[in-house]
Every structure is written in C-alpha cells, then in structure tokens.
A protein has these predicted regions:
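Bacterial N-terminal signal peptides that target proteins for export
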Residues: 1-8
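Bacterial N-terminal signal peptides
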Residues: 9-17
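Carbohydrate-active catalytic/glycan-binding domains of CAZyme proteins
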Residues: 21-559
C-alpha cells in the first residue's frame, strides 16, 4: 500500500483530466507496437468484442460490445491505431430501465455499437436485443454522455450504425437477432429524424444473406465516391468472413463482395469491425478474432481501394479477397507516438473506479468504497439472491478483461468479516460459464481459504472445493497463472478455441507462494471472454450490516 497525503492526492485528481492520469500505461504482458516501425496482431489481446472506431482530426476512438457489464461502452483512444488507452465509458452507471438487477443479465443489453462524430458531437448507437436501438452522445468522448435514448423500439433489433447523408437525411442500418425477432441473416435500413433520436420510417430489408452469407449481421454504414457501403460479417462468429455491399441508392439494389477471409492465415473468422482512414490518406480495417476463453481479440489490417471496392489484408491471388496479416508496418500518422496499452494493474490510488474494471450489472453504490487516500478499494459483502446457486447469479463481481495469452494475476487483500455472521466470502475469481478461484470464507472454524471451481455455472451447477487451508491471519496474497501454448479445443465450433489453463497459489507474506487446488481450464462467458477479478458476498439473510474486504492492489505481470 502506498501512503500519500489525502489532500494532495485529491487536488491532483481534480487537477488532471482522465487522459493525463491514465496515459502511457505499458503492459508487461502484451504490446502490439514492436518499436521498429511495425506492429503485431492482435493489437489488443483482449475481449473488445465487435469493435467500431472513428477518426476525429488526429485522434482515433474505439468502442465495443459491453453486454451486461458496467461501466458500459468503454471508450479507447489512440493517436496511431496501434497504441490504445481507455479514457472512459459512455454508459458509466446504468442501462435502461434504470434499476439494479439482483442478478446479471448475461449476454444481453449492449450489442455491437457504432461510434461516429457529426457536427461537433460524438454519437454511439447500439442494439439491445430485448428493447431496440439506443443512442447516446457527447461533445467530449471522455464525457459526460447523455442518458440513453430509445431511437427505435423493437424486439431483436441489433448491430445498429447511423449514416448522415449529404442531403441532410439520417439513416440507420441494423440487423436482427433471430432469438428475439424470429428472423436473421438480413440487413435493414430505416430513416431517422434530423436529431437522430427517433426512427421516422419503418425498416426496409435491403439485403438477404440466407443463400450466400448466412448470419450476416454487424453492419457498418459509409459513403464514398457516390456509393453507399455496408460492411458486414457473415458465416458465424468463430468461422466467418467479411462482406461489403455497395449501391448508388441508399435502399439498393446492393451488390456484394467478400473482401476478407482466413485463407492460409492462423486468424479464424476475421470479420466485424470498422474502416478508418488516417490524415495521410491511408485506409485501415479493425476486426475481431474469437479464440474462446480469451474472447474476441482485436486485429488491425491494411486496406486499399480497387475499382471502388475495398481490399482488406493481403490479397495474394488478386481476387479481391484478402487474408489477415500478423505483422505489418504501422499506419502513417505523421509522427511517432509513445507506446501505451489499455490499463491493467491497479494500486487503487484513485477515488473512482479505474477504467479497466466492470461490474456484472447496473452499478449499486453500496458495493464499493474507493479509498484513494488510503490506497485501497473496499468491497462490502453484499447479500446474494435468495435462490443463489453459484457466482453466475452474482452482480457485484468486479472484473476485467484478460490481457494476453500468458500472464499472472496477483492481488493483496485483507478480509474483515462481520464476526456475527458466517458464510461471508471474498477472493480472486476467473469467471466464465465455468469458473474457479481462491475464496476466503468466515466459517465456524474461523477463516478458511479454498480453491474452488464450478463446472457449468451457467446451468446452475454447484461449486466444488478442491482444496482448503485454515488461516490465522486475515491478510493474504492470491495468485493465478494463465497459461496457453496455442493448443486448441477440437470440439469447439471450428476447432479454434484456445486451451487456457489456470493454476492457483497463495502467500501469507507476499514472497513464498504455495500452490492450492487443481489446474482449471478457463471457459468463456455469455458472448464474452473469461474475466478475472474479485468479489465480496454474504448469504441471503436479513441483517443491517456486513463485513468487507480491502483490496490493496491488483497486478498483472509476465511471471
């Protein structure tokens, strides 16, 4: 724990904008910038699912699907398309309806957003598969952002993207989730009012992908050289390809071309993302790659225009369809910028939640206290739901994305359970459809540290304890090592999911770590990768107060 003067810390916090506080964090475990004028893919070895990006002047901004996790719609900033940092979130506290669910809405809420800049304002549109198309806007991408506006109500409306045309009209392209709408594999367009706050026409299907491009979704809308372009993925998340539609008329007819596919590369399903250009006139394309437990990783591909068609990646045979690159020269943005990466480790020296963290549902202010002057975050034990089965039912999980293929997470915590209660728990967790962790519990026998795991947590299965040890102190260091040697799960869709093994250990002094329990194979969550973090809970009993855990620091390292 770092001691610091509280008044000095507070004054510095208020004096510095967020970007100044967070800039130039450099990961120990994954850096895309090779320092020699080249970069490697993925540029973000983290689950920024369904990425979209835009350029404003010399600055680039990215956002991605956040589903049920809050703060939602994290905003990333870059000066060169390779080095990124998190600067905020467009939905910082709650998604409509504004209420605090007792349990997470896994995989729901924010699907495939689009970020755009128009007339001095940033807009983000997204589809909520159960409610419809939403929009927020801001003059500054760091916020504040407006409250979400329901632009187009409707079940199954997803993957929305606006286009402001030269004649002043505003259009919205979107897809449908078959699970809610009863129809998928089509792309539709409707018109919005000039304020982009309300649909003023019904949606019209302008492309049917059932024959050639099953599961077409994730459309992004552009206009260039008199053509309307819709970039969309098809073929399914782990195995698909990237398609581009074009037409001289906004409602079509559209012709299509496949512009990016796996080919001979190791990058499965290279699709769904964003076209951006640089001030120097270069064109680039972001897309994701689904690798299972680590989620959907972000890649950057060179792009060029040939006869008014985009060609993405490297087109070896000249057929207009490229394949992904793994290394390439960095974009020409006129100068060289310092290396930086999204934030990971946290000393908890701030008075608000650091931008890499997300809760599993709309945020409840009773979950945590950010004691920046004391350099810790205090997690209060919050009661689980009455029909609790396992941590899949818990909203107050404080988690972050996994940042690399091989890394170690270590945290220091002090557990202060209510002596009148039994069953309060805290600890380190690797969360997904299956999960595992190191859990401290206040029992009749005192404090017990257990390595637990839960298979098929999403199906309501119970946890099992692999190993336990009694503790005589309430401060402990918890560690998990993530290891991946590139081997894949053959039974996964397309056989592309990576095998990720987690090994747990603990220490009483922060120096000597002892292994505890069994190796655990990490598994993805609902539309998201596995995440790592912490929690503090108590049983679903009536009581006027509970205990807490103070987390001193949380560090991600190479070893």
């Amino acid at each position: 724990m770092k001691s610091r003067n509280a008044l000095l810390g507070l004054s510095l916090l208020l004096a510095m904008p967020l970007a100044a506080q967070e800039k130039n964090y450099v990961s120990e475990v994954w850096v895309a910038d090779q320092g020699n004028g080249k970069y490697k893919n993925p540029i973000l070895y983290a689950d920024y699912s369904d990425p979209d990006a835009c350029r404003v002047g010399d600055d680039f901004y990215m956002t991605s699907s956040s589903f049920n996790c809050l703060p939602g719609l994290q905003i990333l900033h870059s000066k060169d398309l390779v080095n990124w940092s998190i600067i905020g979130a467009a939905v910082p506290y709650a998604l409509p309806p504004i209420e605090t669910p007792e349990r997470p809405e896994h995989g729901n809420r924010v699907w495939a957003p689009a970020i755009r800049h128009h007339n001095g304002e940033f807009y983000i549109f997204w589809g909520d598969p159960d409610q419809g198309a939403f929009m927020v806007k801001a003059k500054d991408p760091q916020g504040p952002w407006t409250e979400p506006v329901l632009v187009k109500p409707g079940k199954g409306i997803i993957d929305t993207c606006p286009l402001w045309d030269e004649d002043g009209k505003v259009y919205l392209v979107h897809a449908y989730a078959g699970s809610r709408a009863g129809l998928k594999s089509v792309i539709t367009i409707c018109e919005l009012n000039k304020e982009a706050t309300k649909a003023i026409t019904p949606s019209r299907i302008i492309f049917d992908g059932h024959e050639a491009h099953q599961t077409c979704e994730g459309p992004k809308f552009y206009k260039r050289n008199g053509y309307y372009y819709i970039f969309h993925p098809a073929g399914g998340v782990p195995t698909g390809w990237q398609v581009v539609l074009r037409s001289k008329n906004v409602y079509g007819p559209y012709e299509w071309r496949t512009v990016l596919a796996q080919g001979d590369s190791p990058v499965n399903g290279p699709h769904q993302g964003a076209w951006v250009d640089t001030p120097s006139g270069e064109d680039w394309f972001f897309h994701f790659q689904d690798v299972g437990a680590y989620g959907r990783l972000v890649h950057l591909q060179p792009m060029k225009w040939v006869n008014d068609w985009p060609v993405i990646g490297i087109d070896k045979d000249g057929d207009g369809c490229g394949e992904p690159v793994m290394t390439y020269k960095k974009p020409n943005v006129g100068k060289i910028y310092p290396i930086c990466t999204p934030q990971e480790s946290d000393e908890f020296d701030g008075y608000i939640l650091s931008p890499q963290w997300q809760w599993h549902a709309n945020i409840n202010e009773k979950w945590a206290y950010y004691a920046g002057d004391k350099s810790y975050v205090r997690l209060y034990s919050y009661p689980v739901v009455a029909d609790y089965k396992n941590l899949w039912d818990v909203a107050n999980l404080l988690l972050q994305k996994t940042p690399s293929d091989n890394f170690t997470t270590t945290m220091k915590l002090t557990f202060m359970p209510n002596p009148k209660l039994k069953g309060e728990r805290t600890g380190l967790v690797v969360m997904g459809r299956d999960y595992a962790g190191l859990i401290l519990e206040n029992t009749d026998k005192g404090l017990v540290l257990s390595q637990i795991e839960c298979k098929k947590a999403d199906k309501g299965e119970a946890e099992q304890v692999n190993s336990s040890v009694g503790l005589t102190q309430n401060t402990v260091y918890l560690k998990v090592r993530f290891s991946c040697d590139g081997k894949k799960i053959k039974a996964s869709e397309g056989g592309n999911d990576l095998i990720v093994i987690c090994n747990f250990s603990y220490s009483l002094d922060g120096k000597k770590f002892l292994p505890l329990g069994n190796p655990f194979q990490a598994r993805e969550g609902q539309w998201i990768g596995a995440k790592v973090g912490m929690f503090c809970t108590r049983p679903a009993i009536v009581t006027n107060d509970g205990g807490w855990t103070d987390v001193d620091w949380f560090r991600i390292t190479r070893k």
